[in-house]
């Protein structure tokens, strides 16, 4: 189990968190495609507190899949 955690779980969790860290500056204040006479600005606001349920198998990557986007959006977990 420790061998698999080091080889898969830890690396995958780090990559997931790194991906959301890179993506966070690319999702705010986007301008949605509209007609020439309209402007639609996409804003995302934090929801607040996010609760996550993580299964026992590969717990780090499962937690990263849920925690990283919540933190990137400005929520607390």
Language model region names:
Residues 1-31, 35-38:
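N-terminal Rossmann-like NAD(P)+-binding subdomain of aldehyde/semialdehyde dehydrogenases
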Residues 29-77:
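Conserved small-residue-rich beta-alpha loop and adjacent elements
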């Amino acid at each position: 189990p420790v061998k698999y955690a080091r080889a898969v779980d830890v690396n995958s969790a780090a990559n997931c968190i790194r991906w959301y860290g890179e993506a966070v500056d690319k999702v705010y204040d986007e301008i949605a495609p509209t007609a020439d006479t309209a402007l639609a600005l996409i804003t995302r606001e934090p929801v607040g507190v996010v609760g996550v349920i993580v299964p026992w198998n590969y717990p780090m990557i499962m937690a990263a899949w849920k925690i990283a986007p919540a933190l990137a959006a400005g929520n607390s977990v």
